[in-house]
Amino acid sequence: MPSMDIVSEVNEEELRNAVENSRRELSSRFDFRGKEAEIEHKEFIVTLKAEDDFQCRQLVDILRIQLSKRDVDPSSMEVDDKAIHSGKTFSLKVSFKQGIDSLVAKKLVKQIKDSKLKVQAAIQGDTVRVTGKKRDDLQAVMRLAKESELGQPFQFNNFRD
């Protein structure tokens, strides 16, 4: 019986590469010349620091562009609403979602069951395991998960026949 896992993960190497590319672009951008701005990366949290709140938002856009160039889905980013002002710099934390939250997993399982496909979906920790009789049904579930607007990107692994 074919089965697969639906997960939501960010590749840490690609994230690091996107941050490095953002730093390079930051050093060459004309609007950041002579300004204090930096991008720090620690595991799945990126801290953006700049002299102005507007510049912090520009750093978010730079990071988002570099992520999409490195095939990391920017919808996995969670950007703080307000920049923290300390001294003469503003800092903004960007965290990346790892794993599927239980509420999102429940919504995904409900969508799969409402689609009337002949598959079974079960929540296993931060993944969703889908099993079915036909491979085509699993591919339809893949399409359904990618098209769903749940605010989180999904990847598929452990595809077994």
Swiss-Prot record:
Kindly name one Pfam family recorded for this protein.
DUF520
- InterPro entries noted in UniProt: DUF520, UPF0234-like_C, UPF0234_N, YajQ-like_sf
Q: Which CDD domains match?
A: YajQ_like (cd11740)
Alphabetically ordered keywords of this record:
Nucleotide-binding
Q: Name one GO cellular component term.
A: cytosol
Q: What SUPFAM superfamilies does UniProt report for this protein, alphabetically?
A: YajQ-like
Give any GO molecular function from the UniProt entry. Answer: nucleotide binding
Report the domain of life of the source organism: Bacteria
Q: What HAMAP family does the record tag this protein with? A: YajQ (MF_00632)
- What family is reported? Belongs to the YajQ family.
Functionally, this protein is described as follows: Nucleotide-binding protein.
- List the protein's name: Nucleotide-binding protein Sden_0770
